Amino acid sequence: MAAETRVTENCAVENGVCSSESVSGAEDVWSGNLSDASSADHLVVMVHGILGSSSDWKFGAEQFVRILPDKVFVHCSERNMAKLTLDGVDVMGERLAAEVLEVIKQKPGLRKISFVAHSVGGLVARYAIGRLFRPHRREKSEDLLPNSCEEESKSSIGGLEPMNFITVATPHLGSRGNKQVPFLFGVPVFEKVAGLFVHWIFKKTGRHLFLTDDDGGKPPLLKRMVEDYGELYFMSALGSFKRRVVYSNVGYDHIVGWRTSSIRRNSELPKWDDSLNEKYPHIVYEEHCKAYDVEQNEPTVTGDDGTDELEEELVTGLSRVSWEKIDVSFHSSRLRFAAHSVIQVKDYYMHSEGADVIQHIIDHFLI
């Protein structure tokens, strides 16, 4: 059956889902039912990857609103469209943070916030929440009587309660090193050369991904992002979310490797079998990892499993918070070589086999 589409004064409505383009070029998606839309208090920010656009999350956004019409208001970011994604993770993160604050200002009824990000967009979102984080504090309220208890202020992201932080095929450990970028075939010479020349193609973002950036003598940005650094509360922000989830392709993703997207060492990659779940046929492994206490655990020896010292610092730093790790396989799909796009359902007509991954994200979403 063909989709029913109509255009109102402020938006296009298709099968009960309303969407409109904002001044910044981003796309907002919400329920076409006014009563549902008015009660939605949970902002879901969807962030695309390198050289992408807001339309990359069109299917995912529409599914969120179709299934949770009275709960979520979805904003598909496009402040970092196309070639702007080459400006660096930090520059993109600042733009995204400003964009999110604008959305919050325009929607005063919002109370909660979540992020769903694909590929490099996951790093951009991690940077943005570091900027948007407001620490937990106790402060005197002008409305309280003298000598009364201090008012407690919870930590927040842009003034909203942080709920879900979800990344899909994101290179959390960067792109350098053994098999982190699969199309380099794990050949050390290829990987070394790529690190030297990647900035010619992917500019500043390439330097960040290959950990070759040197901003005035500072450590590489991805290393800075595994701790609170200056006025940027990277790890405090990440830890403030009730859930942190990584979805990773176990194979056939020739852009982002399994290890870097799942925040694991080589020795920690699990053995997996074909899924027996008819609802989620491409989800092959699920793992809930508790926060890792660095002070109470022995340091991991590097080198034997392809993990270098800097990568080990990233794994250890990010493991200081708990993670849900969801492993995905499209090895039987006719489009398995496009796994990096299929896992996101970047284009429904081409990548619809990944729809069960989107369904899994929504079914486990904390409202």
Predicted regions and their residues:
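Short, surface-exposed "cap/lid" segments of acyl-processing enzymes
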Residues: 2-83, 102-105, 132-141
